[in-house]
Amino acid sequence: MMIRYDELKVNDVVMFHGANVRIIKVTETPAPASEYYPNEKTIAFDIEPADEEAEKILGKFYSHDSYAGVGCLELELVKRDSQ
C-alpha cells in the first residue's frame, strides 16, 4: 500500500535500510529556498528499530542509538502499523 510521506504518523512502521523501524517523531521544516519550489516543506523523521533484527541492521550503518532526522526519501513505505 502506498502512503504519502506527509501522511506518516508516530507509531507507523516503515522500512529503512531494509529494517522495520517505528516512527517516534515527525518534524516538518521549511526546505532551503529554491526558485523552483519556494514553498516546499521537508519532513524529517526520528525512528527506532521495530524489532531485534532491525537493531542489527541499523547497527551496520550507525554507531549510536539515535536515528533522528531521517529524510523521507530514505524511507521505503512498507506497512502502516499505528497503535
Model regions and ranges:
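Short beta-strand-centered aromatic/proline hotspots
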Residues: N20-A31
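Compositionally biased, low-complexity intrinsically disordered regions
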Residues: A19-V21, T42, L73
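Short, solvent-exposed secondary-structure boundary/capping segments
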Residues: P30-A44
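Mixed-charge, Lys/Arg-rich low-complexity intrinsically disordered regions
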Residues: M1-V10
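Intrinsically disordered, low-complexity, charged/polar segments
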Residues: E48-Q83
